[in-house]
From Swiss-Prot:
Coiled coil: none
Listed name of the protein: Tumor necrosis factor
Site entry: Cleavage: S34, L35, L39, L40, C49, L50, L51, H52, T77, L78
An annotated GO BP: necroptotic signaling pathway
Superkingdom assignment: Eukaryota
């Protein structure tokens, strides 16, 4: 029933009761009826406004956990992806500490992982299936003192797609740990410079991915898990 109909019914009832009212108590009855009518109309109007603007009423159904969600943290997205399927391609390789002076990836070390079709060939990860992938990598540089010439450290993740066979940089970063030269005779203080990169990309079966740096002689192998490279199918 609409608010207008409720008001019209109240006015009609008031008119009928006013005609029937008589005697010395007629005016008092009309006054009480008017007060009741006012309260009824006010309540009906308030109820209509609350329903119209959605303040009260049936609650909206919450979005199904299986539906799309674009503001979930990356960790939650990965956890949901892993729970939905355990046969998605994944790889996590670490730096080969037995190859000084160069960055070589290895999959036979502790905490390394190669599963569901991903291969490590020619120091590159080979994508086994089409789809969205999280690509990530971290390197850690270490040195003592700063040379007279500028020192720039680069970390680049590249893709060679099967469709055009051209090496393209998809993630790249550059840092300079030295802002001034270490004076002759001054103490050469140690410095550390980590670089982490990650992103989601649409890849094709057979794509090759590489993670490279420009100055491998500055790599820090002191602790395991400091230099790594990996992909996760989403």
């Amino acid at each position: 029933m609409s608010t207008k109909s409720m008001i019209r019914d109240v006015e009609l009832a008031e008119e009928v009761l006013s005609n029937k009212a008589g005697g010395p108590q007629g005016s008092r009855s009309c006054w009480c009826l008017s007060l009741f009518s006012f309260l009824l109309v006010a309540g009906a109007t308030t109820l209509f406004c609350l329903l119209h603007f959605g303040v009260i009423g049936p609650q909206r159904e919450e979005q199904s956990p299986a539906g799309p969600s674009f503001n979930r943290p990356l960790v939650q997205t990965l956890r949901s992806s892993s729970q939905a399927s355990n046969n998605k391609p994944v790889a996590h390789v670490v730096a080969n500490i037995s190859a000084p002076g160069q960055l070589r990836w290895g999959d036979s070390y502790a905490n390394a992982l190669m599963a569901n079709g991903v291969e490590l060939k020619d120091n590159q990860l080979v994508v086994p299936t089409d789809g969205l992938y999280l690509i990530y990598s971290q390197v850690l540089f270490r040195g003592h003192g700063c040379p007279s010439t500028p020192l720039f450290l680069t970390h680049t993740i590249s893709r060679i797609a099967v469709s055009y066979q051209t090496k393209v940089n998809i993630l790249s970063a550059i840092k300079s740990p030295c802002h001034r030269e270490t004076l002759e005779g001054a103490e050469a203080k140690p410095w550390y410079e980590p670089i982490y990169q990650g992103g989601v990309f649409q890849l094709e079966k057979g794509d090759r991915l590489s993670a490279e740096i420009n100055l491998p002689e500055y790599l820090d192998y002191a602790e395991s898990g400091q230099v790594y490279f990996g992909i996760i199918a989403l």
